[in-house]
Amino acid sequence: VWAQGAANTPGLAEARLIEIYQLIGAGDHREALAKSEKLATELPHFHLAQLVYGDLLAARTRSVRAVGDVPDEIARSAVGTLKDLREESQRRIQALQERPQPGTVPSQFVALSARTKHAIAVDASRSRLYLFENSTTGMRLVSDYYISVGKAGIAKAVEGDQRTPLGVYYITSNLDKKSLTDFYGAGALPINYPNVLDTKRGKTGSGIWLHGTPPNQFARPPQATDGCVVLTNPD
């Protein structure tokens, strides 16, 4: 049941990883190791979970100073991967510690039409996507998820700059996974970049989507796309 849940329930795998971090912080390494082994077994493609499990195994015989505290020869051969995973770990913890104030919404959402039932805010600095529901009582934060953005960050200006656009956009369609390659995972939601304002400002480029991950990868590093916003497939 856990294996199926971890693979398909939005946010569950991250919640379990955070629980492991909390157990480590509380000094309960035995329980953290047990839960980490279970998560790593159920989601072998969740690379950060695998790294944390490896750290906990190593901690039984030596001091572990940081996430991904591996022998120097391994660290040198995988310096890029370790950097990405450490950054992913930091962003997930940061998003947990720096929660939005209850009841607050992005200023861009204040005047949304009642016809718009949901709105999405992306905070690239925290590698986080926030899903809001627009109801008769106002905007309500429903959930939030880890995401990856462009390799070069945000503020897209020209085609091929590997940046994620900064602005207000609408989702234009819903592309089923059956119509896409495995690279896009569970599906894709194209947005209307460039919008009218972008065009007036001379911005170029196209094909900016929210989409999932390839089947061999649970999550991508914080900055790993060509401009799209990428979520895990369950999310």
Please place each PLM-identified region on the residue numbering:
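Exported/periplasmic cell-wall-interacting domains
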Residues: 56, 166, 173-235
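Alpha-helical linker/edge segments of TPR/alpha-solenoid repeat scaffolds
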Residues: 57-105
